[in-house]
């Protein structure tokens, strides 16, 4: 007796329903992989559980490429067959399309951050790992490039500073040489001017004979001879003139 046809209906037991979902999902993904390998077809499979968890399978490492291709194809086909009265409907579909795309991007972002990985299959985890490795390679390459450019810029600035320092040192040495030469020249000039100057000429003071006649008369002793100290016996004025005649004249007047 052959096996009867099993009636499909919702499994009421939650545990049995979850177990059946896991088994059927694995079988479905296996069939999708087989058809992609045997027939060289691009397959994208998206499954949501009763709790809202997303399960997907794609032959391309990036699911978005297949979805974008599907969206372009279906949107272009709808545009060809849709009448003008369905413009509002098209806008609604466009909104739903963009909303689904945003949700997909948010989910991928969570995966890149290491979140919501429990529902991913080994192949999905492998694809995610490859994407992260590729991203890390690009990040390291860009970081090394920036570091290399920064080092080159610092070396260029260092070279410019060294050249500027060399130029300043050269200018300072030239200035020191000029100042040293000027100092030597000044020292030579000052040495020539510091020699003892010749004595200034004596200024001769000429006294008027009237002033000489009114000079105090020498002291006379009554009844004696004129006596005068030896140092005053001969006086000479600034004109080297002997005062002896004047004194003799004065003595003659007193004798009279």
Curated annotation (Swiss-Prot):
Top-level taxon: Eukaryota
GO molecular function terms listed in the Swiss-Prot or TrEMBL record: DNA-binding transcription factor activity; protein dimerization activity; RNA polymerase II transcription regulatory region sequence-specific DNA binding
GO cellular component, one term: nucleus
CDD domains for the chain: MADS_MEF2_like
GO terms classed as biological process: cell differentiation; flower development; positive regulation of transcription by RNA polymerase II
Stored InterPro entries: MADS-box/MEF2_TF, MEF2-like_N, TF_Kbox, TF_MADSbox, TF_MADSbox_sf
Region spans: Disordered: 187-206
SUPFAM superfamilies reported in the protein's UniProt record: SRF-like
Chief subcellular location: nucleus
Residue ranges constituting the K-box domain according to the UniProt record: 88-178
Keyword Metal-binding: no
PROSITE patterns, per database record: K_BOX, MADS_BOX_1, MADS_BOX_2
Limits of the MADS-box domain: 1-61
Functional summary from the UniProt entry: Transcription factor that promotes early floral meristem identity in synergy with LEAFY. Displays a redundant function with CAULIFLOWER in the up-regulation of LEAFY. Required subsequently for the transition of an inflorescence meristem into a floral meristem, and for the normal development of sepals and petals in flowers. Regulates positively B class homeotic proteins.
PANTHER family, per database record: SERUM RESPONSE FACTOR HOMOLOG (PTHR48019)
Full protein name: Floral homeotic protein APETALA 1
Species: Brassica oleracea
Phylogenetic lineage: Eukaryota, Viridiplantae, Streptophyta, Embryophyta, Tracheophyta
